[in-house]
């Protein structure tokens, strides 16, 4: 079963046994089943963000929590589950954090506002395959926040860089490139994310 299915089973067990998770884990703010965030359960939306045994999304590389399976753990293993830890992602309840900060960063500049022509123009502007692929690499970021959770400074610079580069590499995005980057970095700083010091933990 998947890691999130395990959490579903745990919650069902807590409800069935009438247990209060507050008594299970001192300091927990919940008085019912353990709250955790999820949506697609297919590794697309990034909502299932958890810190598992000291790693963002757990022991597997390049997967989200919902893609993690319990076969990665052994019987009797102690599994420590924590929410993302960053000033930019305040805890709402249990394992759920508020990731609206990423939306606010995108609202600051993650778009193209200049006229880019009509529908036919989209096919008339030639873009090399290499440029399109590089732009798609940035667009592949699902905004889960693992880069922030892993960074000792709580920096969102990798997220911002992915969004800026996915647009700036395309001809339509070059016009506002500098303005976009400055606005998004300023919003990131305003929201309390740390600075990048090139530790490459992300």
Language-model features: where?
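A short, compositionally biased
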Residues: 43-49
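Ferredoxin-type iron-sulfur electron-transfer modules in oxidoreductases and energy-metabolism complexes
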Residues: 2-29, 77-202
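Serine/threonine-rich, repeat-prone extracellular segments and beta-strand-based repeat modules
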Residues: 34-42
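Glycine-/proline-rich flexible loop or hinge segments
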Residues: 29-35, 48
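Short secondary-structure capping/junction motifs at helix and strand boundaries
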Residues: 17-21, 33-35, 59-60
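S4-like RNA-binding module at protein N-termini
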Residues: 52-75
């Amino acid at each position: 079963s998947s890691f999130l299915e395990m959490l579903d089973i745990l919650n069902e067990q807590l409800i069935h046994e009438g247990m209060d998770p507050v008594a299970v884990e001192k300091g927990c703010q919940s008085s019912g089943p353990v709250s955790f965030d999820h949506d697609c359960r297919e590794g697309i939306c990034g909502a299932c963000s958890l810190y598992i045994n000291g790693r963002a999304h757990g022991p597997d590389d390049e997967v989200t929590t919902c893609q993690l399976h319990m076969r990665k753990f052994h019987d009797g293993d102690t599994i420590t589950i924590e929410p993302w830890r960053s000033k930019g992602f305040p805890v709402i309840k249990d394992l759920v954090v508020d990731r609206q900060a990423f939306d606010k960063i995108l609202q600051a500049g993650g778009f193209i506002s200049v006229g880019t022509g009509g529908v036919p123009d989209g096919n008339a502007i030639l873009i090399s395959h290499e440029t399109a692929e590089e732009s798609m690499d940035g667009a592949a970021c699902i905004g889960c926040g693992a880069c922030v959770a892993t960074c000792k400074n709580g920096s969102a610079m990798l997220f911002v860089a992915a969004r800026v580069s996915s647009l700036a590499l395309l001809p339509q995005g070059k016009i506002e490139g500098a303005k976009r980057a400055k606005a998004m970095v300023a919003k990131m700083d305003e929201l309390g994310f740390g600075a990048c010091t090139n530790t490459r933990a992300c």
